[in-house]
Amino acid sequence: MIKPLEKERRPISSTFESETRQPFDLSDDLKARVDALGLAETVQHAKEEGYGYIYDAAPMEFIEHLKEAIYRNAEGFEGPRGSNMLLTKDPIFAEAVLNPKLLTIVEILCGKGAMLSQLSSTIIPKRTDSPRKGGLHADQNWTPAPFPVHNQTITLCWACVDYTPEGGSTRVIPNSHLLRRHPTSEEVAEEAGVISTECPAGTIVFWNGSIWHGGGTRTIEGERVVLHTTFSRMAMRPIENYDFLGEEWLADKPYEMRVLLGREDFLNKDGTRANLDKVTQTMNWAKT
């Protein structure tokens, strides 16, 4: 089992922060966590290129169990398939969301209080017709350009099989996040500068909300099996709604799960007055 960052409830802040941290200006606590988890090179790559890899994210036994759960919950039995709203469909999905390395990258790219936006899977078989082209986009599709300086979303994909060009890995255009806009139709068609991500099974490949990327074409036998985890800043509406999960379901979950589901901020609740204890914390998280 992958241990969460910590299970104790953190104290609510009572002091408003006046300054907003700029992207990749990490607090001492966050720097220490990055170093302890061996993520320094990963963070630097993400800062420069807009995407990155979390290697050895979990033991291969975990990856195999994750892969089995993806197949077991997929809709359909052949061809491209997958599933959405996976959080409650197998305990291993919640464990994947709470991975300490993953959550550290999420905090760096989307700040404290980031919410789980979507948890889905895809199973992509070998393509027998022409190679896939087009489909380049930025995941901040519902954010107008120019994109904010602070990243709004992050997608992290658990690669349950090797990620290779011939295996249909996600394709990205490095540094495209610096443009802070959506690609034009001409840029989507041309795909100038596109590369395929490459990493072994057991890696989490991720990109920020501004990077231009798209799916690849699998030209070899077998299937590409991936768990997609998307997070957003707490001010954004998530894609999937887990409001139906009550305190009974959350009772044995760590504090981090409450944060990811928006239970520790005052937004989308029954008014500010009823949640005064969380107002300051929410405002401070928004500045990270």
Regions found by a protein language model. Give the residues of each.
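Catalytic core of non-heme Fe(II) oxygenases with the double-stranded beta-helix
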Residues: 131-198, 236-245
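Non-heme Fe(II)-dependent double-stranded beta-helix
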Residues: 2-147
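A short, structural micro-pattern
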Residues: 115, 150-152, 221-223
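Conserved double-stranded beta-helix
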Residues: 2, 179-211, 216-288
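A structural signal for short, well-ordered beta-strand segments
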Residues: 119-121, 156-158, 227-231
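Short, solvent-exposed loop/turn segments at secondary-structure junctions
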Residues: 59-61, 123-124, 141, 163-165, ...
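Short hydrophobic-aromatic micro-motifs
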Residues: 53-54, 156, 205-207
